[in-house]
């Protein structure tokens, strides 16, 4: 397979070429690292969010929007389709890089993770990248520092000038859009956690509503998770059957009936204290090649409306 970071670099170049049209910004740090602002100091938008999601999946997923409803309200929805879901979602899109350098904190996703490849899922998908450039998207309230960029370069094994850092707040249009593009990722990662071979997922598609942009990060985290857990729908075509497909959907979690903001409760919540079942799509359909078709879960528009603050 082509290098994930090579494919993502082409998308980063596209972002740099169309910064004005996408309402994003770009600059170089003193280290030579390129920072692309998708939604920290710049507004970004739907198209910026779609490109951000493509960057996070290293171009292996088709990401687009359509208009649909949540209750009686109209919302854009993000659709994702992918024929390499194990590599695209677990090897790139998963937010598995916790970056903390001095006072700067961010959650990293994207193909630079595959240059490090120390997370367990890389062994499961049998993929490690080797490339001279690294693309890591950062979910953070601030733009990256030179020290943070140097840390990324050191861990990825590339020069600081070869690092590209698309950055965004959860509470931004691009943040809401890219979060809605994580339906398939949640399903594939949940299957991996449950012991299913992720490479047996042959193709995948999903959709979820784009959460209203919140005024603060905590509310944004709640709304974007609600969009997935109560509004996300996923279809998988798989090679092998499994007796725990039903545990993938969010309704398997103990507090399924509550908006995410009520599940986490406080500003200092820890994801490690939350039932993993919450981080799943609302509905899952699985087609087993040569076998049965399974369907689990349901969309909960009532919980979505509550979490989105619809009136």
UniProtKB/Swiss-Prot annotation:
One GO term in the molecular function aspect is:
methenyltetrahydromethanopterin cyclohydrolase activity
Q: What class of enzyme is it?
A: hydrolase
Give the Pfam families listed for this entry. Answer: MCH
An individual GO BP term:
one-carbon metabolic process
User: Domain of life of the organism in this record?
Assistant: Archaea
EC number from the UniProt entry: 3.5.4.27
- Where is it chiefly localized? cytoplasm
Looking at the UniProt record for this protein, which Gene Ontology cellular component terms does it annotate, in alphabetical order? Answer: cytoplasm
Q: Which reaction does it catalyse?
A: 5,10-methenyl-5,6,7,8-tetrahydromethanopterin + H2O = N(5)-formyl-5,6,7,8-tetrahydromethanopterin + H(+)
| Cellular localization per UniProt | Cytoplasm
Identify the keywords attached in UniProt to this record, alphabetized. Answer: Cytoplasm, Hydrolase, One-carbon metabolism
Q: Which NCBIfam families match?
A: one_C_mch (TIGR03120)
Family of this protein: Belongs to the MCH family.
Q: What does this protein do?
A: Catalyzes the hydrolysis of methenyl-H(4)MPT(+) to 5-formyl-H(4)MPT.
* Name used for this protein in its record: Methenyltetrahydromethanopterin cyclohydrolase
Q: What is the species of this protein?
A: Halobacterium salinarum (strain ATCC 700922 / JCM 11081 / NRC-1) (Halobacterium halobium)
Gene from which the chain derives: mch
């Amino acid at each position: 397979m082509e290098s994930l970071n090579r494919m993502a670099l082409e998308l980063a170049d596209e972002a740099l070429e169309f910064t004005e049209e996408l309402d994003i910004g770009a600059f170089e740090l003193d280290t030579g690292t390129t920072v692309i602002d998708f939604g920290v100091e710049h507004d970004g938008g739907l198209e910026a969010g779609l490109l951000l999601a493509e960057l996070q999946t290293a171009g292996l997923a088709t990401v687009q929007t359509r208009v649909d409803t949540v209750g009686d309200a109209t919302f854009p929805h993000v659709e994702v389709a992918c024929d390499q879901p194990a590599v695209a979602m677990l090897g790139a899109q998963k937010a598995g890089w916790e970056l903390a350098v001095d006072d700067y904190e961010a959650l990293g996703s994207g193909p630079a993770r595959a240059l490090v490849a120390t997370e367990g899922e890389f062994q499961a998908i049998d993929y490690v990248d080797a490339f001279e450039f690294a693309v890591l998207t950062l979910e953070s309230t601030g733009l990256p520092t030179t020290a943070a960029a140097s840390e990324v370069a050191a861990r990825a094994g590339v020069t600081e000038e070869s690092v590209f850092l698309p950055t965004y707040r959860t509470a931004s249009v691009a943040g809401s859009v890219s979060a809605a593009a994580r339906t398939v990722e949640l399903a594939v990662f949940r299957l991996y956690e449950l012991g299913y071979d992720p490479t047996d997922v042959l193709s995948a598609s999903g959709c979820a509503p784009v959460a209203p942009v919140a005024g603060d990060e905590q509310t944004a985290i709640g709304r974007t998770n609600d969009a997935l857990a109560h509004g996300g729908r996923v279809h998988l075509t798989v090679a092998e059957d499994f007796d725990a497909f039903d545990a993938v959907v969010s309704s398997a979690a103990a507090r399924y009936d509550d908006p995410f903001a009520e599940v986490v409760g406080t500003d200092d919540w820890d994801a490690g204290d939350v039932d993993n079942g919450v981080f799943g799509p609302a509905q899952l359909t699985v087609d087993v090649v040569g076998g049965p078709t399974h369907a689990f879960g349901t969309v909960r528009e009532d919980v979505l409306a509550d979490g989105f603050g619809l009136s």
